[in-house]
Design a protein with these regions (language model features):
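A short acidic, amphipathic alpha-helical/loop segment
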Residues: 26-27, 49-53, 127, 154, ...
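Signal peptide-proximal N-terminal region
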Residues: 1-12, 104-106, 133-136
């Protein structure tokens, strides 16, 4: 309608990486000569590898709500833009919410992080460890290997340890499996909360009504904006 972005035609080049960091780097190297405007890796692991390359090449990386959290320091990471939120924000917001839910104190509570065993999934761990020391809750991190279809041992561990709350940094099929496994062990769904990549409708559909009460963080606008009306 507008002849492109500000009147400039933009061609979108896609690469199938299978969430594989090496393939993502290969994609970057093979396409950067096309006159790249910006790259969106959609992978924290790829983002870490591409930051020095893109910085040297003068090409921006847009990692919206993912990637290297410390890249929000623009004085150091001049070519990386990770607004509007990052994983440290997400961990902090989740803990603040849980603190409010527990009457203003997390002292002595047990909070478990179920995370995708990748650079992405590990991003919130230092923040949660620091917040555990600050607020007095017991923190444990449990890894789930990609793609996440096998989680029985992790959820048996959760059933044994009975944490007060479970946070999830999941991805793809891992989310569906985790929510179903939580239902299988009768974990209180109202005490289970995911990051924004674990909050799609398809994540809760397989568990049906058993997923009622599950929550997820969100940074996307949910009300009507003029630009959304124009797109419609």
């Amino acid at each position: 309608r507008d002849g492109g972005i500000g009147g400039e035609q933009v061609r979108i080049i896609e690469c199938e990486t299978g969430f594989n960091t090496e393939k993502g780097v290969e994609c970057y190297e093979s396409t950067k000569g096309e006159g790249a405007l910006v790259y969106q890796p959609l992978s924290t692991g790829m983002t870490y590898q591409l930051i020095p390359k893109a910085t040297a090449d003068g090409i921006p990386l847009f990692t919206m709500g993912y990637g290297r959290t410390s890249a929000e320091n623009g004085a150091v990471f001049r070519n990386v833009f990770n607004f509007p939120v990052n994983y440290w924000d997400g961990a902090s917001i989740a803990v603040k919410y849980l603190k409010d839910q527990h009457g203003g104190s997390l002292e002595g509570k047990k909070i478990t992080l179920l995370y995708h065993n990748s650079g992405y999934g590990k991003e919130p761990i230092p923040t949660l460890e620091a917040l555990a020391a600050k607020h007095g809750f017991k923190f444990k991190a449990i890894a789930v290997d990609h793609p996440g279809q096998e989680q029985k041992s992790q959820w048996l561990q959760i059933r044994r340890e009975r944490p007060d709350n479970v946070l999830m940094w999941g991805w793809g099929v891992m989310n569906q499996v985790a929510i179903q496994e939580a239902a299988n062990i009768n974990y209180p769904m109202e005490n289970f909360m995911g990051v924004w990549w674990s909050g799609a409708e398809i994540d809760v559909l397989p568990a049906g009504g058993s997923s009622n009460g599950y929550k997820a963080l969100n940074f996307s606008p949910i009300k009507d904006y003029p630009v959304l009306e124009e797109i419609k």
